[in-house]
Each structure stands twice: as structure tokens, then as C-alpha cells.
Amino acid sequence: MISNLFTKIFGSRNDRTIKNLRKTVALINALETQLEALSDDDLKAKTAEFRERYDNGQSLDDLLPEAFAVVREASKRVNGMRHFDVQLLGGMVLHQGRIAEMRTGEGKTLTATLPAYLNGLTGKGVHVITVNDYLAKRDAETNRPLFEFLGLTVGCNVPGMMPQQKKQAYVADITYGTNNEFGFDYLRDNMAFSIDERVQRPLFYAVVDEVDSILIDEARTPLIISGPAEDSSELYTEINTMVPLLELQEKEDEEGIEGDGDFTIDEKSKQVHLTERGQIKVEELLTERGLIAEGDSLYSAASITLLSHVYAALRAHKLYQKDVDYVVKENEVIIIDEHTGRSMEGRRWSEGLHQAVEAKEGVNIQNENQTLASITFQNYFRLYETLAGMTGTADTEAFEFQSIYGLDTVVMPTNKPMVRDDRADLVYLTQEEKYEAILVDIKDCQERGQPVLVGTISIESSEYLSQFLRKEKIKHNVLNAKFHAQEADIVSDAGLPGTVTIATNMAGRGTDIVLGGNWHSEVEKLENPTDEQIAEIKAAWKIRHDAVIDAGGLHIIGTERHESRRIDNQLRGRSGRQGDAGSSRFYLSMDDALMRIFAGERMTNMMRKLGMQRGEAIEHPWVNRAIENAQRKVEARNFDVRKQLLEYDDVANDQRRVVYSQRNELLEEGDISETITVIRGDVLSNIIDQYIAPQSLAEMWDVPGLEERLKQDFLIELPITQWLADDNKLYEEKLRERIEESVGQAYKQKEEMVGDSVLRQFEKAIMLQSLDQHWKDHLAAMDHLRQGIHLRGYAQKNPKQEYKRESFELFAEMLENLKIDVVSILSKVQVRAEEDVEKVEEQHRKSENAPREYQHEEVEHVGGEAPQSATVMARSEPKVGRNDPCPCGSGQKFKQCCGKLK
């Protein structure tokens, strides 16, 4: 009550932010007349002037009013489009490293040109990140003439480009591209074998379009580069035959009463669990097939991999549906993005799930993969010095943006008032009744010449509805992953009078639906359009546009509520752009997934008791509130999953930063002989300690064992027993020095034989090869650790703390093994000439260039307690001093821990 009173008197925080920014808008507007008087050449010269002023110490904030005014004037001349005041406000919010929530049709693409130009003046590179290749190419081509007029270069970064093309794209002042491609390039750069193979520059400034889709929806799915591992396709086929023999237990066991099924399903977390009866049955089936020994348990160390195969097969059959979660195309299983409804070719589920789905569908089973490199979007985007984003729907997730990325959300006012009529939801008992009501609504709109966009949450729903409309002979277009290629044409026609378009979720997002149809696409179809033809097309469009406005604008029909309110709002947001007329309504049934999981049987029974007749619907604010509460529950759970994923990945991220930073230093240094000497000293000291314990009596020394070990690891025979017999005063310290000196001399002789430059090159090649191999193995070990870490909760231990402790131990062990490997290889190998070095480099390149897959992992709920506090975004990383605490969290000094490698 009191907070509402204060808001009314002083305005909300958002209102105050907008009010302050409007002062700068007034300054920009005041410059317009002055800039209009400039010639094209004088306007172009402004870029060089701004760069000079920036180099002389002026900040970008000082240049902002003039720079924005110049971009607006250039846009008027090049594109014939003038930035509205709300777009100037949005540009300022983006420059400040915040999220601008701008409604559909408010011109986000044009808004992004303002901060992109301003930050592009630094020459450090600006990344404009979109959700798909089509939008990246479209926006780059649309804005290229504007930026080139102002003297800035534009690049486009999409999949399938050659390394040289990628380099050129990244060297540009402004680079458009997809979130996946920027992330994969970062991982590839950190797998490069030479500096020349790297393409990215240091990450400076990024504007993320559809920021909610990229930083929220896709944040649960890490980017993974993987390579093929062992072939186990026969095992998947064998286990696939077992699933039909297992029975579902409809209800959980109650108060010790044993159920009558083999497994249970948890729809909320997309998991299956074997019952005690199911475990016994699976063991019998595996024994029959000769996969485990008689009497062996499913949970024994030898059978634990079989257990993961069984769970993968059960999930594939019972939780993943064809045409909802994936499609089968050309003998291949292709994942469907649950948020956009698009097919994601090339992406695969991990942990054997994709192979299990392939076995279920009877298509070719591709090999499992080994992770070579991975990063979450949360940790990738936090590498940028400044991160900003824009979307039509961010306010519902403002807390998550702030707590995880440190990004404030500012809601932009619309250029024209919003007049869309958002009607209350209608809830029916059955799906059949719901679809009948939708049909009546569509027919009514079509008769009045009102275009309709029907949003579904899966391909299956869109095809069911399409079949329903075909029976009624209603002409319509379908926009889903199966018709991805025709997307642009379907969207451009969606605003025509009486047109019915069915779209999965937010397919076609990023492209505005223009009332009356898109006249630009009509002009583009003509080879050499004359002014008269264009005028005719525009006149015809104006008649259609006015007819659609009179009919009520674009009508949105939602066939189901999504688990996120934001995605429902995105669907609604397709209508009512730029003050246009429009309307929206959601039709629900008690059979819908969200209603079934959260409303349950109680509400269905209540509706039946109320004596609802067939075709009758409930329409009440209470129902809307109940649905919103259900959505909030799902959103809260998904937020916990993302936050938890981040906390676990932060542990790996600290290690990733250490490894990648040392790898980059290795690439940049021509001579790493000092590092090799230090490593050799450490390894040798540890080996000697094992056989000659520090400050121990000579009688306790294992001298023959030490001689044998040195022969094995360093290929050097030292007569230590003879040295001790010849010199009674050869104590421990002097003996150590003599051994180290002898090993060093042997290495020096190798250097003299081969040549200094050849050995330096060989050292670097071996160091890189060993580091990459150990890092891959470490990633696999970390994966296995995380999969089972939640079980520590049963032992009253905090899974996260246990994960941190054990992952640090694994990391320390990896560094030690790496040192031993490097020293051992360099000591043993016989390098005769430069060709040997080239052979090692070529061998490494071949292994690195083996077929790779770029994918999003299907993330499980990692278990453990919910994190107490979220990590706030750090925009820059200070250099870690050798005596500072190690960033990996061990509590040791950096030089005694991860810094040992350096």
C-alpha cells in the first residue's frame, strides 16, 4: 500500500530512468537541424573526428549525443528511416550495458545500430548476436549500407564459414552472428594449435537480440564440442528390445505398499525411476541377453554403464515423443527446440539419450561422443567487457537477469499507445471441445477478413490442428520446423486479410507480421521494378491494410499455455505493433500438459460437479490467476535449475580459465624452455621424495628403486649406488643436486644434438598436445563426477561442497599427471630433425580436425540444495599474482597450486 503510494508520487525506478535519459534525447534532437545542413562527405567525416576525440581521451559517453544524431541523420539518407525518440532511449540503455524491453514492431534492429556505431568507434569490435542464421544475415545486409556510409566495416559470422572468412568477419568493426557460433568460435580458438588459427579478438561489447531466448531459455544447455568415442550401437539396440517388456507403475508406492509396475515417470523433471521389482526384472533381462553375469547386480561397478543405457532407453520411449521433441528426417533423428519449435540439425542429446531415441526409431545409430570443450552461455557472455540486450519480453525475468548477469532491465515506452484487446482465457474440459471452439473463432475471423495467427507448443499440435482445418476446408499456412525453408514467405503473408497461419511457439520470431501483407516482398519478386509498379503495389497494400484494421487487426489464438508467461507474452506481442489494432485469446483444456501437471484432478472434478455442459467454458479471473501461479512455479523451478547449473559450471569455469590462459601463453611464447626446466625440477623432486624421504636416514632409502624409476621415466641410467659407495659425505641434499644436474646435462646433450630451435619447437608441440589430451580426460572425469554427486546428499553432505572439493582434487591430479607426461616424453623421445617436430604437430592437427559435433547438452537436474546466493557478473578479470590465493578455491597460493604450470 505504502510502496504504491510512493510510486504514484515519485514514479517507479523505471520511470525515473526514462526521465533522466530524455534529457539526452533533447540534446540529440537539438543537433538534427545542424546535421541536416551537412553534405554527405561532411557527415561521413564525423566518424574520423569522433575516433580522434576518443583517442585523445574523450569517453564514449561524451560522444554519445553527437554520435547518435549522426547515425540518425545517416539512416534518413541511406535507409529512409528516422530513429524515433524511444529508439534513441533504447540505444542509450543498450550502451550502458542494460536490457531494453521494447515491444514487437518498435524497431529493435534499427535501435541496435546506435550503440553498435558508438562502440564500433573504439576499433575493439562490436558483436550483435541473434537467435538464428537468417536474422544474422538479414540484419547484417540491412545495416551494412548505413555503417559503410559512416566508414565502419561490417562482418557476418554464421556456421559453415572457412577460418579465413571468420577472421575477416571478426576484424570488422561490427560483427553480426548467432549466439551458438560466437560461443563455438571461443571454444575452437582455445583448441587451436597456433595463434594464426585463432579467429576471435578479446571480447569487448555485445548486443544480444531476443536476449530472453538466449540468456534464459538456452542457458540450461551448455555449448559442447565433442568427438567420437567407442562404438556401442549394438548395446543400444539390445536394450531397446527390453523396454516394451517393462510396465509403467501408474502411482508411486504408498506407505510401504509395493506397487505393481517396473518404473515410474516424473513428468516435471523428465526423469524415470526403476522400482525394486523393475530392478530385478531388468537384471533378469540383461542376464538372458548375456550382458551381465548370473547373480550380478545392476548397481555393481561393472554394470553401472548398463544402468545409464537402461534409463536412456526408458526416457527415449516414455518421455520423448516424435513430432514433439524430435522429428525423423532422412533416416536421422533431429531435435526440435522446445522454445522456438525449430529443428536443430547437428545438435544431439548427450548421455546416450540421442542413441536411445535412434534405436527406438530404428534409424542408424551414431557413435557416442567424448567432450572436447564446453562452456555455458552464462559463462561465455560474462566474458564480455560490456553486455547488453533487447527483447519484447524481459520484465518477467528481470530478477534473473540482475542476479546472474548483473543486467538491469528498463521497459521502454511505446512510440504509439498499445490498443490490443487481450481477452481472458477460456478453459474447457476436453481437448476436443477446445479445438471446436478454436475452429468457431477462426471461421468468424475469416468471414470478417481478419488475419489469424494460431500459436501451438509442438509440431504434433500444429499438425493436428492443420488436419482439423483441412477437414473443414479452411485454407491455412503451417509454420513449424518441417517447413523451416518457407518461413519468410509464410510470415510475410500472415497479415493478409482472412489469412490463417499456424505457428509452433515462436517460429518466425524476429520478423514482423505487417497488416495487409508485406509489400516489400512483393517488390523483391520483380526483377527490375519501375516506380509505377512500386506505386501500384503500395496502393493495393494500403487498401488491404485498411481492410484488416477495420476487421480488428491481427487476432492471436493460443492453443495452450506455455510453461513460461514470457513465451505467452511473446505470442501476444505479434499483434498490436506500432499502435495497430489487434486482439488475443488463449483456449485451454484440462488435458493440456500445464493444467494436467499443476491443476490436477481436483480442478477437473470440480468443473464436472459444477455441471458443465459440452462446449461450455470457464472464463474467470480466478482461473487466470491459478494458471499464472502454475506458470510461476515452473519458472521458479527452471530458474533454480539454471542457477544451480551456473554454480556447478562456475567450478569448471575457474579451471577452464586457468587452462585456457596458460594455453594462450604457450601459443604466444616462442621459447618455453624455462617452463620445461621448472616442470622437470618439480617432477624429479617428487620422484626422489618417493624413494628418498626428506630428512630420513640413509638406511631407509630405496636407491635401486630410484635408479629403476629414473631409467623408466627419463631413459637415463645413473650409478647412484656407486656414487654413495665412493663418497661417504654424499648426503641427501647434495645427492638431490647431483641427480638433478645429471638429468639436466642429459637433456642439454639432446639439445646440442638436435639444435636449439628444433627442440624449442618440439617442447611447445608436446606441451600443447599433452595439455589438450589431459584437459579432455579431465572434462570426462568432471562429467562423471557431476552425474552422481547428488547422491552425497543421502550421506548428509552438501553435494556442491563435495563437488568443489573433489573437482579440485581431480584438477590438481591432472596438473601433476600433465607434468609427468611432458617431462617423460621429452626425456625419452628421440628427435632427429625438424621433420619429427612437424610430424607431431600434424598428428595433433589430425586428431583435432577429426569429425566434431557442436551441440547443446540436455541438462539434468543436478541435485543438492538450492544455491543461497547467485553469482553477480564480473566484467573484467584482474591478473592473478603468484602470491595471491588461487582462483580455483583450494586456499593455497597461486604459485603453489594452478600457477605451478607457469
Swiss-Prot record:
Main subcellular localisation: membrane
Stretches the record annotates as Disordered: 836-902
Compositional bias (Basic and acidic residues): 840-863
Catalytic activity of the protein: ATP + H2O + cellular proteinSide 1 = ADP + phosphate + cellular proteinSide 2
PROSITE patterns assigned to the protein according to its UniProt record, in alphabetical order: SECA (PS01312), SECA_MOTOR_DEAD (PS51196)
List of residues binding ATP: Q87, G105, E106, G107, K108, T109, D512
Entry EC number(s): 7.4.2.8
Subcellular location: Cell inner membrane; Cytoplasm
Cofactor: how bound: May bind 1 zinc ion per subunit.
Pfam families the record matches: P-loop_SecA, SEC-C, SecA_DEAD, SecA_PP_bind, SecA_SW
Enzyme class: translocase
Molecular function in Gene Ontology: ATP binding; metal ion binding; protein-exporting ATPase activity
Source domain of life: Bacteria
GO biological process assignments: intracellular protein transmembrane transport; protein import; protein targeting; protein transport by the Sec complex
Topology class, membrane: Peripheral membrane protein
Residues binding Zn(2+), per UniProt: C886, C888, C897, C898
Similarity annotation: Belongs to the SecA family.
Reported function: Part of the Sec protein translocase complex. Interacts with the SecYEG preprotein conducting channel. Has a central role in coupling the hydrolysis of ATP to the transfer of proteins into and across the cell membrane, serving both as a receptor for the preprotein-SecB complex and as an ATP-driven molecular motor driving the stepwise translocation of polypeptide chains across the membrane.
Subunit structure as annotated in this protein's UniProt entry: Monomer and homodimer. Part of the essential Sec protein translocation apparatus which comprises SecA, SecYEG and auxiliary proteins SecDF-YajC and YidC.
Designated name of the protein: Protein translocase subunit SecA
Gene field: secA
